[in-house]
Curated annotation (Swiss-Prot):
EC category name: oxidoreductase
The organism of origin for this protein: Drosophila melanogaster
EC number: 1.3.8.7
Post-translational events: Phosphorylated. Phosphorylation at Ser-347 by Pink1, may contribute to regulating levels of acylcarnitines and amino acids such as C3 acylcarnitine, beta alanine, arginine, lysine, and argininosuccininc acid, but does not appear to be required for function as a acyl-CoA dehydrogenase.
Residues reported to bind octanoyl-CoA: 163, 212, 274, 277, 345, 347, 397
The keyword Cell cycle belongs to this UniProt entry's keyword annotation: no
Stated name of the protein: Medium-chain specific acyl-CoA dehydrogenase, mitochondrial
Subcellular location: Mitochondrion matrix; Cytoplasm, Cytosol
Length: 419
């Protein structure tokens, strides 16, 4: 079965619909958790793998050097159905579960995490609407992403509010049937190319108001008067991704674009991460797997003292540790995705997966450069880019320190509940 765009493959939608009931429980065995893949999942995984080898890897270095947004890749991925496949079926999407979309994310990240982030960030922007939008909002804003290759963006981070979301200063004031937004956002992925944004703004000016009631989520059109993207940031890695600041000056948003209602924004924003952190972890695994493959290949070819360096125990142990990191990280994202697909809150497992995969990706990338020696420090070899690309995984969608904070709080809450 070829995963084609839903407009070109009505038969695919019918087949996915028929198999959805089975897919929803495909990871459950009589003895507990099972990660056996369905035929549909294997075919999507293979499609993403083929697309990565043929379309992404050959041009990844070019986009890294130019910093251009990979629109040609985005359009091809959209045509094949490698984008937006988590959009609900009643809107016309495939409504694939988190586990299945993570399979695709890992394969795409193997080729270039900058390009994968450009694809995945659109999913991050869409998720608040998928989780909390009403029928009209979903049809209007998710529907257009199925009609043509457009992307969305998640607009929350600010110059003074990253991990501390409660520090957001962007404000929205209600005036008649509209809300007027003023403020500045920072480090917004897809900031300059998005068709629309999910925006979190403070709607209760009382500094004593708890975050759970102080913020509201809005859908904001890119062409809204007063909305101005800044320059594209020149980042260390993942340069194919478009990252910018966004300025809001008296941006008027109709009341129809409020998600759920006033004061519900913080819950929406945080709930989004339970869905999106597993794909981020899967992306880190894709990068780590690429590092391991490149390092192993090089170690078998490069000779010192008359033998391939792979024969030296020091290198063997490094490769073994890299394999351990890849496999444990893969298991972690699979468990976190499986949990949310079972309808259970997965914050604990999602944070473990995101934190562990990010840390392992950075260590594995560093070890890959070490195995390459002087060549690893040169941009003509792939591991130099991989090491630069890896760092952001410890930062975006919640730093590794924030993930550890979430994990520890979950542990404390569980311990108190058992006392």
């Amino acid at each position: 079965m070829a995963f084609l765009n839903k407009l070109a493959a009505p038969a695919l939608r019918q087949l996915v619909s028929q198999s959805r009931a089975y897919a929803a429980v495909s990871h459950v065995s009589p003895n507990g958790t099972s990660f056996a893949l369905t035929e549909d999942q294997l075919q999507l995984q293979e499609l993403a793998r083929k697309f990565t080898r043929e379309e992404i890897i050959p041009v990844a270095a070019q986009y890294d050097k130019s910093g251009e947004y990979p629109w040609p890749i985005i359009k091809k991925a959209w045509e094949l159905g490698l984008m937006n496949n988590h959009i609900p079926a009643d809107i016309g999407g495939l409504d694939l579960d988190v586990f299945t979309t993570c399979l695709s994310a890992e394969e795409l990240a193997y080729g270039c995490t900058g390009i994968m982030t450009a694809l995945e960030a659109s999913g991050l922007g869409q998720t608040p609407v998928i989780l909390s939008g009403n029928k009209e909002q979903k049809k209007k804003y998710l529907g257009r992403l199925l009609e043509e290759p457009l992307v969305a963006a998640y607009c929350v981070t600010e110059p003074g509010a990253g991990s501390d979301v409660s520090g957001i200063k962007t404000r929205a004031e209600k005036k008649g049937d509209e809300w007027v937004i003023n403020g500045q956002k920072m480090w917004i992925t897809n900031g300059g190319v998005a068709n629309w944004y999910f925006v979190l703004a403070r709607t209760n000016p009382d500094p004593k108001c708890p975050p759970s009631k102080a913020f509201t989520g809005f859908i904001v059109e890119r062409d809204s008067p007063g909305l101005t993207p800044g320059r594209k940031e020149l980042n260390m890695g993942q340069r194919a991704s478009d990252t910018r600041g966004i300025t809001f000056e008296d941006v008027r948003v109709p009341k129809e674009n409020v998600l759920i209602g006033e004061g519900a924004g913080f819950k929406i924003a945080m709930g989004t991460f339970d869905k999106t952190r597993p794909p981020v972890a899967a992306g880190a695994v894709g990068l780590a797997q690429r590092c391991l493959d490149e390092a192993l290949k090089y170690a078998l070819e490069r000779k010192t003292f008359g033998v391939p360096i792979a024969y030296h125990q020091a290198v063997q142990f490094m490769l073994a540790d890299m394999a351990i990191g890849v496999e444990t990280s893969r298991l972690a994202w699979r468990l976190s995705a499986w949990e949310i697909d079972q309808g259970r809150r997965n914050s604990y497992y999602a944070s473990i997966a995101k934190c562990h995969a990010a840390d392992m990706a950075n260590k594995i990338a560093s070890d890959a450069v070490q195995i390459f020696g002087g060549n690893g420090f040169n941009s003509e070899y792939p591991v130099e880019k991989l090491m630069r690309d890896a760092k952001i995984y410890q930062i975006y969608e919640g730093t590794s320190q924030i993930q550890r904070l979430i994990i520890s709080r979950n542990m404390y809450e569980a311990a108190k509940g058992q006392a």
